[in-house]
Amino acid sequence: ERYWSEENHDFFVTSAAIESAGYCRWPRLKEIMEFSRSMHYQKLGLAFCAALKKEAAVVERVLRNNGFQVVSVICKTGGLDKSRAGVPEECKLQPGQFEAMCNPIAQAELLNSQDTQFNICLGLCVGHDSLFYQYSKALVTTLVVKDRVLAHNPVGAIHYADTYFKDLLKG
C-alpha cells in the first residue's frame, strides 16, 4: 500500500525501470545518472569522505559532464575537533592532537540549504552515514561504502567469512 502513495510510487517504479534497463550492463554510477534523469532531478548532492576526495572529484566531473548540477560537501566540513562533540581523547587516532571530526549532520544541512533533489553518499563512516541519511531532506543513495581494509569493498569479507575472515568475524 505504501508503494502506491504519491511520494513513493514514481520513485519505486522508476527504480524498477532503471534496474531492468541496465541490468548487468550499467555500473552503479550510470544507474544513478539514469535514475536521476528519469526522475527529472537536475541538482544532486554529493556527501563524501575526505579519504575519497579523488574519487569524489571523478564522480562530480562525470555528473557535471552528463548535465547535472552538483553540490558537494566533504565530511570534515566545519573543521571542528572531535572533542567538541564529546569524543574522548583515547578514541582519537592520535590522542592529544587536533583531529577534525566528521560532520555528517552539517553535510546534510548544507545540502538541504542548497535544495538538492537527490543526494549521493560516497564513503562516509559507519554511523556517520546513518546520521547523514537521517538529516538529509532529499532521499539518499549510496555509491560507495567505506571499508578501509578491503579497498571499499565490504562484500569481500562476506565472501570469505568462512575462510580468510573466519576468526576475525566469529561472534
Residue ranges and their predicted role:
Residues 101-116, 124-128:
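A short, acidic, amphipathic alpha-helical segment used as a generic capping/interface helix at domain edges
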Residues 55-62, 129-138:
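Short Gly/Thr/Asp-enriched flexible loops that form oxyanion-binding sites at enzyme active sites
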Residues 42, 117-118:
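Conserved acidic residues
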Residues 1-43, 50-54:
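Electropositive, gly/pro-rich neighborhoods at or near active sites that engage anionic ligands
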Residues 141-171:
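C-terminal functional extensions of proteins
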Residues 22-26, 48-56, 78-79, 119-130:
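Gly/Ser/Thr-rich loops at beta-strand to alpha-helix junctions
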Residues 55-107:
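Long, charge-dense
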Residues 69-76, 131, 135-153:
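Short, acidic/small-residue loops that bind anionic groups at enzyme active sites
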